[in-house]
Swiss-Prot record:
Homodimer. Residues 146-168, 348-382 are annotated as: Disordered. One of its GO terms (molecular function) is heat shock protein binding. Disulfide bonds: none annotated. PANTHER family: DNAJ HOMOLOG 1, MITOCHONDRIAL-RELATED (PTHR43096:SF52). Keywords: Chaperone, Cytoplasm, DNA replication, Metal-binding, Repeat, Stress response, Zinc, Zinc-finger. Zn(2+) 1 binds at C144, C147, C201, C204. This is Chaperone protein DnaJ. GO terms for biological process: chaperone cofactor-dependent protein refolding; DNA replication; protein refolding; response to heat. Binds 2 Zn(2+) ions per monomer. The keyword Cell division does not apply. Participates actively in the response to hyperosmotic and heat shock by preventing the aggregation of stress-denatured proteins and by disaggregating proteins, also in an autonomous, DnaK-independent fashion. Unfolded proteins bind initially to DnaJ; upon interaction with the DnaJ-bound protein, DnaK hydrolyzes its bound ATP, resulting in the formation of a stable complex. GrpE releases ADP from DnaK; ATP binding to DnaK triggers the release of the substrate protein, thus completing the reaction cycle. A zinc finger (CR-type) spans 131-213.
Length: 382
């Protein structure tokens, strides 16, 4: 399957483009590539591509989802028709017909599509990082098994509506000032279904649907983050007889972790070290999502220094590598010192503030200073 182009690239706009700029650019490109105006073989495909980009970027919610998760955020949350639903295409009212042959889901006539449902799913930090399968219980309307969704009593069947002849629509013609006006309305006898039920099903009362609780398995991909939405097509409420079911939208909420935070696909953590480890350097063990990892603290490290552990972050959506773990070190300052520790620190301070020795004494001083530091380390880490 061909990779979709970036929506901003399609419209030739920067990512911070205003809604007004997006609309203005769309109108210009739509006029240029509309199949009624442009007879080039690729014009219709280009027009569809432009219209899809506009439908997403002109909608605040869809644009935010796209900016955060890319095409995966749109494809996981919206059906093909939902992408275009609600978009203002100006004078290009044939968009829906061009894409879907005029079949508008949940339109004003005919049996109604089932309602979409939403479920808030809470997962742990680790589950978001590595992915998880969750079984959830969803209360929803389903097709009645007694009447197989027809709404009619077993052994009987719905009859064609005598008022509309099974179309679900009634056309009315009236003449005014010598001109004829034709209007089409939903049939009031069958309420747009085209059928009437003379003997309703005793279980569903003729609705063709009943309320049930269904267990559904949700596959949360590795790299999921709070605010991400997963669309499960057809897992919403059942539609009226002859109409499709709605969709189920799973909204992801990632619970906070005691030690880790997340920025995009990077993991942020803190590590406390002693001031002797910071001054002399040391190898320390760091907790990661993948277990403990050895990390080197170089001599002279300052508090709040940040070290990067490559590929110890979170799996990117759809398997394109991992983020890193950023470890910020915090140097612990001792609060209770015994007499020996105080004396050693005073000796070290005196050496640090002392005048530079002569060349022949420098070596001795350096050795003495090192000896003091080793004593300090032993005193504070024993």
């Amino acid at each position: 399957m061909a990779t979709k182009r970036d929506y901003y690239e399609i419209l030739g706009l920067p990512k911070d483009a205003s809604v007004e700029d997006i609309k203005k650019t769309y109108r210009k490109l739509a006029l240029q590539y509309h199949p009624d105006r442009n007879k080039d073989p690729g014009a219709e495909d280009k027009f569809k591509e432009i219209s899809e980009a506009y439908a997403v970027l002109s909608d605040t919610e869809k644009r935010a989802q796209y900016d955060r998760f890319g095409h995966a955020g749109i494809d996981n949350q919206y059906s093909a028709e939902d992408i275009f639903r609600g978009a203002d295409f100006g004078g290009f009212g044939d968009i829906f017909e061009m894409f879907f042959g005029g079949g508008r889901r949940g339109g004003p006539m005919g049996p109604r599509r089932g309602s979409d449902l939403q479920y808030d799913l809470y997962i742990t930090f680790e589950e978001a990082a590595f992915g998880v399968r969750k079984d959830i219980d969803i209360p929803r309307t389903e097709r009645c098994s007694t009447c197989s969704g027809t709404g009619a009593k077993p052994g009987t069947s719905p009859k064609r509506c005598p008022t509309c002849g099974g179309t679900g629509q009634v056309r009315t013609t009236r003449s005014t000032l010598g001109m004829q006006f034709i209007s089409t309305t939903t049939c009031s006898t069958c309420h747009g279904r085209g059928q009437i039920i003379e003997s309703p099903c005793p279980v569903c009362g003729g609705a063709g649907r009943v309320r049930n609780k269904r267990t559904i398995t949700v596959n949360v991909p590795a790299g999921a983050d709070s605010g991400m939405s997963l669309r499960l097509s057809g897992e919403g409420d059942s539609g009226e007889p002859g109409a499709p079911s709605g969709d189920l939208y799973i909204i992801i909420h990632v619970m906070e972790h005691r030690h880790f935070k997340r920025v995009d696909y990077d993991v942020i953590s803190e590590l406390s070290i002693t001031f002797t480890q910071a001054a002399l350097g040391a190898d320390v063990m760091v907790d990661t999502l993948y277990g403990k990892v050895k990390m080197n603290i170089p001599a002279g490290t300052q508090t709040h220094s940040v070290f990067r552990l490559r590929d110890k972050g979170i799996q990117r959506l759809h398997g394109h590598g991992k983020g890193d773990q950023l470890v910020r070190v915090i140097i612990k300052t001792p609060t209770k010192l015994n007499q020996e520790q105080k004396e050693l620190l005073r000796q070290f301070e005196n050496l640090s503030k002392g005048k530079k020795p002569q060349e022949e004494e420098k070596s001795k001083a350096e050795k003495h200073k090192k000896g003091i530091f080793e004593k300090v380390k032993d005193a504070f880490e024993s």
